């Protein structure tokens, strides 16, 4: 399993995984979630991929098919009178394909995100 930044070619798989997540939410909370929808559209995903401060990391199999993702966002704590400025990497969403669970893909994605945060000088990783 390889982990890399998401690319435009990953959008169909990202949408499929986002749909899996939304389906779970819709089953648990049908009063607020609409089945068959996703958090982002194709266009929104394409725009997200261009934003350096919102990296999307994907775990891909030997055929380069996305089996899981971590949507992240770089946040900077601005200077205030009681805190020094620092950067953190926020994990907005993490998903592993339901057919690939139990293979430590989520754990690998989380470890990769932590390493990326460290390399980018982040103070912390938050969920």
PLM region descriptions:
Residues 6, 94-96:
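Hydrophobic adenine-recognition pocket in adenosine-nucleotide-binding enzymes
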Residues 23-45:
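Conserved GNAT-fold acetyl-CoA-binding loop/helix
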């Amino acid at each position: 399993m390889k982990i890399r930044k998401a690319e435009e070619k990953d959008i169909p798989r990202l949408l499929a995984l986002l749909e899996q997540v939304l389906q779970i939410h819709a089953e648990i909370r049908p009063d607020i979630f609409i089945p068959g929808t996703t958090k982002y559209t194709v266009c929104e995903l394409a725009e997200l991929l261009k934003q350096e401060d919102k990296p999307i990391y994907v775990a891909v199999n030997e055929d380069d098919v996305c089996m899981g993702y971590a949507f992240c966002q770089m946040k900077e704590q601005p200077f205030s009178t009681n805190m020094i400025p620092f950067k953190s990497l926020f994990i907005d969403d993490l998903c592993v394909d339901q057919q690939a669970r139990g293979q430590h893909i989520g754990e690998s994605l989380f470890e990769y995100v932590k390493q990326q945060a460290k390399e980018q000088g982040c103070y912390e990783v938050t969920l």
